[in-house]
Curated annotation (Swiss-Prot):
Lineage of producing organism: Bacteria, Bacillati, Actinomycetota, Actinomycetes, Micrococcales
Gene: rpsK
GO biological process: translation
Keywords: Ribonucleoprotein, Ribosomal protein, RNA-binding, rRNA-binding
Organism: Pseudarthrobacter chlorophenolicus (strain ATCC 700700 / DSM 12829 / CIP 107037 / JCM 12360 / KCTC 9906 / NCIMB 13794 / A6)
InterPro entries named among the record's database cross-references: Ribosomal_uS11, Ribosomal_uS11_bac-type, Ribosomal_uS11_CS, Ribosomal_uS11_sf
GO cellular component terms, A-Z: ribonucleoprotein complex; ribosome
Keyword rRNA-binding: yes
HAMAP family hit by this protein: Ribosomal_uS11
Oligomer and partners: Part of the 30S ribosomal subunit. Interacts with proteins S7 and S18. Binds to IF-3.
Name by which UniProt lists this protein: Small ribosomal subunit protein uS11
Length: 133
């Protein structure tokens, strides 16, 4: 029986530098995490970051500081692709909403407009029961 040969070794594909000046920043801020996705105008994701991805675990992911770090990381990666101006879409009730927007501006992205696109139920599913602490 001949010795097994390993398959072709795959080289990691280098991301091609897109040159997109205008885009959209989608901030999803839940009670447990904050996810920042920066897309081109068609909606194709250019860069993203979340509180968990930048190194926070557990209940620290839901803090405004974690949202700030995630937004900065996503903005830096987007600027490598030539992003300069974003329109911001915020979704969810979490604590990192405003902090994420501020840190996008601080990272050097110009914020054009801010829209709240939080989905509101028209009396759909029953919400979770009240917490008793």
């Amino acid at each position: 029986m001949p010795p097994k040969t390993r398959g072709a070794v795959r080289k990691p594909r280098k991301k091609d530098k897109k040159n997109i000046a205008l885009g959209q920043a989608h901030i999803k801020s839940t009670f447990n995490n904050t996810i920042v996705s920066i897309t081109d105008p068609t909606g194709a994701v250019i860069s993203w970051a979340s509180s968990g991805e930048v190194g926070f675990k557990g209940s620290r992911k839901s803090t405004p500081f974690a949202a700030q770090m995630a937004a900065e990381a996503a903005a830096k990666r987007a600027q490598e692709h030539g992003m300069r101006k974003v329109d911001v879409f915020v979704k969810g009730p979490g604590s990192g909403r405003e902090t994420a927007i501020r840190s996008l501006q601080a990272a050097g992205l110009e914020v054009g407009s801010i829209q709240d696109v939080t989905p509101a139920a028209h009396n759909g599913c029953r919400p979770p029961k009240r917490r008793r602490v």
